[in-house]
């Protein structure tokens, strides 16, 4: 992938950009095999990759510069700003949005937040695109509600320029820290969720719900999990750390009982909406802590699917699963190091199948799907 920002030494986020994709995949596979070297793996499936560029469905832009000439991108460690509107990871559809946002920031008088001076209002612009219909969600992260009335007043101009903006919100993040968003979300549109569709499964994206940033690879990840589950004698499963329900909604059948657990209530609202659309009445989604939910149960289903954050599922949940011994565990991980650590805490299981998904090209990161079977 060619990147003028990298070539000019202005951005180093894609540290592996000079390596061809096959070499990147080989290095990631070697890393994964090294992490799982202590465990016999019955089947290594071929790694899955997607497009080299233009694959991201989300942009997280730090806003800097002046209100007349805002920059959208990032801050270097020394505080100097870098405009990343031309980043080749973004699809071509993002360029006209960035182009319209710069004059809009001036029109609405949204002074960019100055980290050094702790002054200004507009901290971040967060943009998400649906692959299914090209609709977009735009979030303005502000320090306070001071400029909210001005933003509302100027908004019709932006909506006229960009009819693809289906969901527009303001998020209030008052703290002087590098935190992307605060708790308060103010909707400026009637529509509150972005419609997405993977493999004929309707999914919803709300402002404060996590959603995978590489839809081409994520849709293959969900489809693979569905195929693996279909091969197992499973009538009842848990989907822990379920997010918007991507795994559970793909794996569920009309006669299967499924419970999805996720701490973020926004994500659970999305999952419930999808389940209702699919007419799946035996699916239950609840906004709870996954570990607390599981360890309070006196029995387990045949299959437990886990998709934890980078820290992994942790020892308490590993101990519980070891004791309760569901017949199958499917572990989806964005951090193979913590997954390997967790697998070590599940001594009663063998690894039947592993597959790497190159969710984050040009970096050392990857997603991995692992099927564990009780010995």
Swiss-Prot record:
Catalyzes the formation of 5-methyl-uridine at position 747 (m5U747) in 23S rRNA. Pfam families: tRNA_U5-meth_tr. NCBIfam families: meth_trns_rumB. Keywords: 4Fe-4S, Iron, Iron-sulfur, Metal-binding, Methyltransferase, rRNA processing, S-adenosyl-L-methionine, Transferase. It comes from Escherichia coli (strain SE11). The active site is at 334 (nucleophile). It comes from the Bacteria. PROSITE patterns: SAM_MT_RNA_M5U (PS51687), TRMA_1 (PS01230), TRMA_2 (PS01231). It catalyses: uridine(747) in 23S rRNA + S-adenosyl-L-methionine = 5-methyluridine(747) in 23S rRNA + S-adenosyl-L-homocysteine + H(+). This is 23S rRNA (uracil(747)-C(5))-methyltransferase RlmC. One of its GO terms (molecular function) is rRNA (uridine-C5-)-methyltransferase activity. GO terms for biological process: rRNA base methylation. CDD domains: AdoMet_MTases (cd02440). Belongs to the class I-like SAM-binding methyltransferase superfamily. RNA M5U methyltransferase family. RlmC subfamily. It is an enzyme of class 2 (transferase). [4Fe-4S] cluster binds at residues 3, 11, 14, 87. S-adenosyl-L-methionine binds at residues 212, 241, 262, 307. Gene3D superfamilies: 2.40.50.1070, Vaccinia Virus protein VP39. Its EC number is 2.1.1.189.
């Amino acid at each position: 992938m060619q990147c003028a920002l990298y070539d000019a030494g202005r951005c180093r986020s894609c540290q592996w950009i000079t390596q061809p994709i096959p070499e990147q995949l080989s290095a990631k596979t070697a890393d994964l095999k090294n992490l799982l070297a202590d465990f016999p793996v019955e089947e290594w499936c071929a790694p899955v990759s997607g497009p080299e560029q233009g694959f991201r469905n989300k942009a997280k832009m730090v806003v800097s510069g002046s209100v007349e000439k805002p920059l959208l991108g990032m801050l270097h460690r020394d505080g100097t700003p870098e405009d990343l509107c031309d980043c080749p990871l973004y699809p071509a559809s993002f360029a006209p949005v960035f182009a319209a946002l710069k004059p809009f920031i001036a029109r609405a008088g949204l002074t960019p937040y100055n980290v050094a001076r702790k002054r200004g209002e507009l901290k971040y612009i967060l943009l998400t695109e649906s692959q299914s219909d090209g609709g977009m969600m735009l979030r303005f992260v502000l320090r306070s509600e001071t400029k909210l009335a001005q933003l509302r007043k100027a908004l019709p101009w932006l909506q006229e320029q960009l009819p693809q903006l289906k969901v527009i919100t303001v998020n209030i993040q008052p703290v002087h820290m590098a935190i992307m968003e605060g708790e308060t979300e103010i909707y400026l549109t009637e529509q509150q969720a972005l419609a997405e569709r993977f493999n004929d499964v309707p999914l919803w994206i709300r402002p404060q719900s996590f959603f995978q940033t590489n839809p081409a690879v994520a849709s293959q990840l969900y489809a693979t999990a569905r195929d693996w589950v279909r091969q197992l004698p499973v009538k009842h499963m848990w989907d822990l750390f379920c997010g918007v329900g991507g795994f559970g909604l793909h794996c569920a059948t009309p006669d299967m009982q499924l419970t999805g657990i996720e701490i973020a209530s926004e994500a659970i609202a999305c999952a419930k909406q999808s389940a209702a659309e699919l007419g799946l009445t035996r699916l239950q989604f609840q906004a709870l802590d996954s570990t607390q939910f599981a360890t309070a149960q006196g029995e387990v289903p045949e299959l437990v699917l886990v998709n934890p954050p980078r820290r992994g599922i942790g020892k308490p949940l590993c101990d519980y699963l070891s004791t309760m011994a569901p017949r199958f565990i499917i572990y989806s991980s964005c951090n193979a190091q913590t997954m390997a650590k967790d697998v070590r805490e599940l001594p009663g299981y063998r690894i039947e199948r592993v597959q790497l998904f190159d969710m984050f090209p040009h970096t050392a990161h990857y997603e991995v799907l692992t099927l564990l079977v009780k010995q």
